[in-house]
Amino acid sequence: MSKTTEFIKIGDRLVIKPQGADYDLIPGKVYDLSYDRYACDDIFKENGELSLPTKIYTSKKDEFFKKRVLTYFNNAFTDTTGVMLAGTKGTGKTIMAKVLAKESNLPIIIVDPQYPEHRLIKYFKQISTPVCILFDEVDKSFDTEKMLDFLDGLQKTSKKLVIMTCNNLHKVSEYLQDRCSRIRYLRKYTTDDNLEFLDILINDMGIKNVEEVSKFCRENIKLLSMDNIVAFLNEVKMLEDEDTTLDEIISVMNIEHVQPKGVSSEEEPIDENDKDDEDDFDIEPIDYDDYDD
């Protein structure tokens, strides 16, 4: 009778060998790491590929930053390269995080915001394959001081590219920010970064009067996030053959914008010609004696 091995030895402990086939992490493939709090167990599974727009708009700063990060990671002797991308929503940091991850040509592990920080070091120390680890919005979901412990604990393991995004850098531990050996690269995004390719975006969408629309966006949209820009340009494209001004288009959209002169942000403008005569609103006093029995 053939004999099968049912146990593995870890230190002085014997553990029943789990069933299943051997599996190697695949470069470029996305994996999700989450935690089942009821079963007190990690959940690690495949998740296809990163979702990216068909066309990605990046600035010269983005290209320079990306090249520096990947060049260093590919040539560095250190085991972990930390990257922080900070900025308001819609400024491009999440797209850059995905682009960096994809172009690293590493297996990509996205860590669930609810995953316990104290388990991170132990889990990733078990992975000997070089990987890219993504943390989204660390300022909202993780204790960033503990993230420094995590980066410290990853040293002397296999090479790992750790990419973090945050909306508010002020909410990130100053100790994490000021440790270049852990977070080596920091890119701060502002809405002004989107201005670099605004005209290209307008032109790509086939909108007429590129200069006029570009000038209007720059002068009137208060938060030039990609979400606001694209939403507004879609409306412009849809209505450009109608007799509708850019001010009228943006006036009913959920985009904070500069009000045209003479228009209060609190109420609709009043056309003096449409005002009713004050006499029309006069009400004759009631003589209550008429109602006496």
Question: What do these predicted ranges mean?
Answer:
Residues 83, 133-136:
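Hydrophobic positions in the central parallel beta-sheet of the AAA+
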Residues 115-116, 139-140, 168-172, 190-196:
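Conserved nucleotide-binding/hydrolysis micro-motifs of P-loop NTPases
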Residues 63, 101-130, 144-145:
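Short glycine-rich substrate-engagement loop in P-loop NTPases that contacts/grips substrate
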Residues 139-181:
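Conserved catalytic/switch belt of AAA+ P-loop NTPases
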Residues 44-82:
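Pre-Walker A (pre-P-loop) alpha-helix and adjacent loop at the N terminus of AAA/AAA+ ATPase modules
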Residues 76-97:
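Walker A/P-loop nucleotide-binding motif
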Residues 1-29, 46, 54, 178-293:
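C-terminal alpha-helical "lid" subdomain
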Residues 97-98, 102, 229:
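Hydrophobic transmembrane helix bundles of membrane-integrated enzymes that assemble
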